Amino acid sequence: SMQSGQLVIKPVSAQLTYDSEWFGSMDCYAKLTVGGSVFKTRPAHDQGKHPNWQETFTAMVNGDQVMHVAVYDHDNVTADDYIGECQVPLQDIYSRRNTSNWYTLMRKGKSSGQIMIILEFVPSGGMGNMGGMGMGMGMQTPGMNMGMGMQPQMGYGMQQPQMGMGYGMQQP
């Protein structure tokens, strides 16, 4: 199917309005569930309401329509505190290939903040999948031309201005 392949999931950061800590700072992490896989970011240590994760996970998906995301405050002593959750719709990702969005986290019917997630979809290979094929070929051709097609232009176009710089660089 056109909707089977790899879903690259990048929970980037969050802006939270709910604070679970009376003392000290929150160490929040995100838990993402899709296609039978569960991923957890590292707790953003002492980053409070502005956790910055910048992590990347890869899930195999097959037409999955929703990814569930929940944010918790990691607690060493008691159970982790629940901050909020959202459902990330995946319908768009199969055609658009990559999206970058803020999603509202809900807790007990109220917004508890927002989470930024970048998604990329890489379709499984196969003749039926022209999009995937096209991307593959498109990637290869510039690589091939790099040696032949690009070099003369770099040589002719750039050579004269860079000659002086080149020598200047080499001498010291």
Predicted feature residues:
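Intrinsically disordered, low-complexity repeat regions enriched in Pro/Gln/Gly/Tyr
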Residues: 1-2, 120-172
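Active-site substrate-binding loop specific to GH73 endo-beta-N-acetylglucosaminidase modules
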Residues: 117
